[in-house]
């Protein structure tokens, strides 16, 4: 199927990824990991909720953790729209499409609407959020990974093509993609609304499942310092994938798993993707440089493990192919 262009006159104006709502069995352990380890700021905590944000974020939160005794899960993926008028347009659009959608309330946010996307991912859109001065210029308080902002998420889905079509209709632009060699059979799509390469990635796999959240830091040295800081805090075993560089997006990265198993990427080096005549970059599925330009492949768990969305049934992927894993790589060396 040909690669379609994004809708340049979308029904409402989504501006960026806003926030992610995740589960936590122990909010104090979660706080230690994100605040003391990664260097995020806590903006609110009570017995059932923990709100955090990164150094450059003037809004109240980009991560919310809710006390939850069941299996680890993701409750919501949040996006920002330009203003409240766009929320009304969104509600009208989804009602017209007969996609269940409702207004709701969340602490520290303005009007919010909830719905599920075509992959079954629970979404919410808001236009406003409480604000206060960020820690950006309080350099003495920059610790851990010195994370600047929540940049993107990656989600595994059983049907990448349908997710791509759905988000393209909402104005998300394709910047890079993975396809089966010699075809446009989509295995992964990197989609954006803000200035750089992605707000959300949909990749082929059992889903819907949140693969990771990604926090941007301005320098490569911060990625390495984050690893050192986590080790000094006794959190070295939380590393999920060691430092390397992705071909797709050009990110220099490290991955951790938080106390509940949610995967977190700390990265730098994405590039701007702005001009209207820029074409998306294609990667063959067989080209392993898309995942790592150098270094070892990811371990098997990196490809198959993730965070389920609450009350959502997992579906087997429509496309089948075994990834090149660290275990496979080491076996060939033996």
Which residues are covered by each model-predicted region?
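The feature marks the first
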Residues: 2-32, 36-92, 96-102, 306, ...
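A signal for specific C-terminal beta-sheet/loop modules enriched in small/flexible residues
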Residues: 62-79, 137-142, 213-217, 279-288
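Core segments of cupin and vicinal oxygen chelate
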Residues: 12, 18-59, 104-107, 114, ...
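Vicinal oxygen chelate
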Residues: 2-10, 16-25, 68-158, 177, 186-191, ...
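Short, flexible, glycine/charge-rich loop motifs used to bind or transfer phosphoryl groups or to couple energy/partner
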Residues: 10-11, 67, 143-144, 203-204
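Conserved short beta-strand elements that form part of the metal-binding/catalytic scaffold
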Residues: 40-73, 121-130, 176-211, 216-220, ...
